[in-house]
Amino acid sequence: MIYGIGTDIVSIERIEHILNKNMQGLVNRILTDHEKALFANKGNSPAFCAKRFAAKEAFAKALGTGIGKVVSFLDLTVRNNEDGKPYFIPSEKLRLYLLEKGITKAHLSISDEKHNAVAFVILEVNQETN
């Protein structure tokens, strides 16, 4: 059963502008250590950063809380499986919150084109929970 749906779109140019002004500030605010290593390996790609930003915003929207008190950018790591499919790894604090809400699964789709990055998230709960 669907708990929530979230989507976010972000201008890659906007992220690039912020990275040019204050790369460390933005990177430290939105990327986990694992993501920082990937970001560096990808030549500090604005598209990489924009996709992670959009994914985390979409997750927070699906959760219904937005980024803030319940979930921060650093509470979520976006990884890819061996086939390239993206998925989330929540922090322990967020994992416990999701368990409390009965949320058992998060589906993530991320895409980018020349100017924009977009992410779509569906959160699921068990039928018995709701």
Model-inferred region functions:
Residues 1-130:
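Core catalytic alpha/beta fold that binds nucleotide/phospho-ligands
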